[in-house]
Structures are given as structure tokens and as C-alpha cells.
Amino acid sequence: SMGGIRMLPNVTPAAIHNLARGMTLKNAAANLPYGGGKSGIVAEYGLSTQERLQVMKGFAHLLYRYHDVYLPGPDVGTNDADMKTIAVESGLDNAVSKPVDMGGNQIDQLGAAAGGVIIALDELLKEMPRLRSLSQFENLEVPRAEELTVLIQGCGAVGAHAARFLCSWLPGARVTGLSDENGYLYHQDGLPVDTLFNIWQESGPVTRQYFLNSLMEEENTPSGMKFSSEPDDLLRESAFCFIPAAPVANYLDTDSGSDPCMLVDQIGRWHVIIEGANTYSPDPERKVFRSRMERAVYRQMGVMIASDYMVNSGGVIFAAQEQLIKTPGHLRFPDEYKGNARAVEDWLEDHAQEFSELAEQRLAAAESHRDEVIRCNIREMIDLLVSDADMLPNEAAEQISIRRIAARESDKKAVEIMESIPTIPIASTVKLAAAALINSPSPILAVVDDDDQLAGVVTDWDITRATSIGSPDNLPLEQVMTREVISAVPTDSILDVIRKLEHHEISAMPVVSGKSVLGMISSDLLARQSLLRLLQSQI
């Protein structure tokens, strides 16, 4: 699995669970071969440099025991430098989103997620006319790129870069409104994006500073410029596209009880929302709020909604390249360097050119993958929505992700998911087999001969049957075992395995190569991995 480390004073296990579920859908939507993961650190704001270093070192050691199932990256409260600390402690391949000197890419500085949002907008301009087959969109008019107006809520790594990419990639398009924590700016003819981006890079929040600078340089300020100290009032303005890019999941609702940024009946006129911010939650109550909002905004008002993990996966796509394009063996620092920052730095300096070339290779692959998959997501969303007038955008998005998970999992082979199976010598007794089954979570035992080859299997049912007919405890095991074994081979697909289990009405079977026992697959294992319910519909 892959997902970031969130470090906040109030982060909770429940929040981490919800975020991990969201990452599952995001990684699937990004067409990446990883499940969703997340981890959390409870820490106060304002840690000193040394305190932060010690926290990250300690957490790296805690995470290492899970290095074969979880790849950490940055999230709220952590950054690329923290990932470098983890890599120093645990090895280059045990963290993603590392700095360029380790072969990574500066994801926030490159605007990886923001780029995906603007790619989604570009694709929507082409695909949205198909929505006219739905009654709420029958009068939809899609502007040309040079006539496009956009509002952006939030001026962080996503919002600021989205504004810059919009003006660069879609010449003539205008960012007419932009908000941050201090307020919002609006001008119907477009804001000075380059100026605002430079302010953001230099000092962070832009709206108030730009407004105050404008008061002192009135002759250089466009007439009609509006500033409000209430950030949420940006949502009252009208534009073709609204991009939520602030760390607020609940930006709209029909009921003030959920504490949204704005009520639906108070927003301006929009035609599409592209969610740069993370808004998904598996929490049942939050999902009810979300569907309620979409019924009002999408179905009644005719505003298309491009769900967050369909469009903002650029960051995880960029990070994943550090695993998809492996670090060559000769660039991995020796194990004895782990934990020795000075030795690792010397190693990186000695191989700086090769790491730089590796970073460029990964960047090119990431940009290509991001552009292709996000355009595909938009096309698939529109396909689903126009085929079912009752479907909501969040339902379409979830269906796309789950469909990809199912496709990926169905391609897996038995050898990739099997678990160990206990074995017992054929010379054993029924009593010993019964004890072995009681002491093992496995529903079956593999019975092996003197050459350690499969001779049969014993199940709870075999033991129960032997007991019911009064068989003595010392009865040889070979007299009650099942000799005609239903088994899987390593190359069986998951669908093949499920078909065998269901056809023969068994709950488990060994995986064998020739007569050698490799492991076991059971219906319980498939259910634990959430495969069964995803794949049964395809049988």
C-alpha cells in the first residue's frame, strides 16, 4: 500500500482509517498497482529542527517492520525532507516523494496534483457537451479555452500551481477569483496570476498582501478589483469552473448543520466543479451529506462535479514512479550507512549525476502517466453519467475505482496471494491431526509423504466424520484423509480459484507445483482481501 504520513496535534486513528480508504480509491483511479495506506503522528506544531528530526527518525524505525506492505510519503504536516530522513534511516526504497538528490521529485514545487486538475478541466471542455443528453444540462454552453473563467478556493501547493498552469496551458483562460486564509480577490477580467504566484512563493498568503500593496500603488491596480476578508464569500461569485483547493472537505451543503463553507442556495453560477482538495470520506454520515449536496448541485442545478480522487492524484502518481522505476542496485547505499546522515550525504554527492538523471526519467514517466489516466477518468465519468440519469458523480467515481481494483485483483495469480498451510506427516494419527487443526487458524492440513510431497488433505470434516463412527485416537491418518485433492497451481488466476472453490463446494485448497505444497488459498483469505465481493459478479 502507499500513502502519506499525517503529523498533526489532533490526528486520530479514525481519521487515518478514512484517509487510507480514500487512498485506496485514489491509487485505483490513478491506475497504480498499490492499495491505499496512511499513517499518523500526534505532534504539536512548532517542533524545533532537532525535535522534528528525532520524531521522524523514531517513526522511521516503527514503520520499518511494515516496509514490505506500506510505502510512506508526505501528507499534511510532513514534507520531502522528512521522507529523506526516513530513507536515511531505512533505505532509499522505503519512502517515496524524496528530494531530487535521492532520485525523487519535489512534488509540491512541481505542482503535480495541480497539473492533474487543469488536465481534467481541459478534458472536460471536450467531454461536457455529451452531458446535454441529461435534462439538467440540456442548455449547457461550454466556452472555448480563451473564454474560460475559473474560481480557485485556496492558494497552497494545489491552488497556486493550478492558477499558473491554467494561464500557461489554456491561453486566454482567466482566474477571476482566488482565496486563501486571509480573504479573497476577485476581478471579472482576471487576476494577475504571475504576481500572485510570486507573492505566494516568497511569503505564503497572497490576498491581503496584494490588496494592501495595491492601495499603495493605485495607479498600477486594475479598476474593479475586489477584496474581502471573508474567504468563503468567494463561493458567492460566478464563473464557469470552481476549483476547491483548500484543506476543507465540506465546501458545500444544503444544510448548515454540517458546517459547510457555503450553502448551495448562496453560491454563484457555476457549470463545473473540479475538486483539487481531498473531499472523500467513507464515514456513513459524511457520505449522506455528500450525496445530498450532489443531488442539489449536480442533479438540480446542472453543475458537473469531477470527484477529488479522479483528478487530484498527480502527487501519488509522481511519488509512485520511485517504486515503478526502481533505484538501480549500484545507487542504493550500503546497509551499514543506514542512520548515518553524513555517510548517506557523501554517497549522494558521489552519485549526484546519476540520481539527477534518474529523477528526470521518473518525472517524464509521471507526467505521461498523470495526463493519460486523468483524461481517461474524465471520459469514463461522463460515460457512466450519461448512461444512467440517476447516477451521481461520487457514485460514478467510486464505481470506476472499484472496477479497476477488481480488474487488477482478478489478474493476480494464486501464488501472489496464497498464505502458508500447515503440514503433517502421513504416518501421523487422527488425534495428532485434530490437535494440529485446533492449534492452527487453517481449515485444512496438507498431508505429506516421506519425500515431503502432497499425499492428501485433512479437514475439520474428516476429523468429525472419523469421531462420529467411533474411530480410535490412534487411527492412522491416511485412513481418513482425502486423497483426491482439489488444488490450485501457482499460475491460476483469482477467478480460477474462486470457480474451483464454488464448483467443488469447498472452503480451502492447497496451492501445489507438481506434488510440492507451496501454500493455501481459502474463501476466508479472499474475503479478508475484499476480493470475493468484487469478483463474484464476473464469474
Segments (PLM) and residue ranges:
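Short hydrophobic beta-strand motif reused across regulatory alpha/beta modules
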Residues: 455-461, 507, 518-526
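The conserved cystathionine-beta-synthase
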Residues: 423-442, 448-449, 467, 487-506, ...
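Adenosine-phosphate binding glycine-rich loop
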Residues: 266-409
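Glycine-rich phosphate/diphosphate-binding loop of Rossmann-like nucleotide-binding domains
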Residues: 108-237
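A short, polar/charged loop-to-alpha-helix boundary motif
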Residues: 462-478, 525-539
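Rossmann-like adenosine-cofactor binding region
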Residues: 183-186, 191-305
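Bateman (tandem CBS) regulatory domains
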Residues: 412-422, 428, 473-485
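Glycine/serine-rich phosphate-binding loop and adjoining beta1-alpha1 elements at the start
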Residues: 7-8, 24-148
